Amino acid sequence: MSLSTPLFEGSRKLMWLGAGELGKEMIIEAQRMGVETVAVDRYDNAPGMQVAHRKYVVDMMDKEAIIAIAKREQPDAVIAEIEAINTSALEELEALGIRVVPNAKAVKIAMNRIELRRTAAEVVKVPTTLYAFAESPEEVKKACKDIGYPCLIKPEMSSSGHGHTVIYKEEEVDSKFEEAIKHARGKSRRVVVEEYIKIDTELTVLTYRYMTNGGVVTKVIEPVEHQRPQGVFH
């Protein structure tokens, strides 16, 4: 991307769908390179909006609203920064010739736990814990019996771990299934049931890609360990 002058005709422009703390940091870096920035989120005065050139407050699940903003702004690229986005809108933006980063297919898979699990375990063949998909308490009970208690239950789609619980015995299935559905994004009643494994630590491994000399380079950042005393990340 070539450098430009924000707010002038022909300026380079990026639009963020989601304007949280991560989006704010990205917007600041983009502005240092002379990029015009647009922040979109569901609530006003989100962190990214505090530094962006322009902001929009809309329901992030409103497909038509997202498309209308993109058509108005005509950004060089749209960046998906949060999980709660209408992924169909991203697909339509690509069809309109607007670049989406990451691409709409990748975002759709990453935001859907069933598609992500299938891609990781069945397509890429990454070793994972035992798992099953279910749409009713009866199917969850069968999955837990096959996998063995305790089990994790998660909504097909949600954000920030909402709706994740551990099922220790069959009597808990009905209530914890409803808990998962209550926090689900959209109208899906599908859940993922997973083998529960007690772990000593949790690592985040970040990858990033960039283009250079006509090619794409993929690199990995050193793993970051998380600690959660009293359930709070550190």
Tell what function each PLM region has.
Residues 109-203, 208-234:
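Active-site nucleotide/adenylate-binding loops and adjacent lid/helix of ATP-dependent enzymes
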Residues 1-106, 110-111, 138:
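ATP-binding N-terminal substructure of ATP-dependent carboxylate-amine bond-forming enzymes
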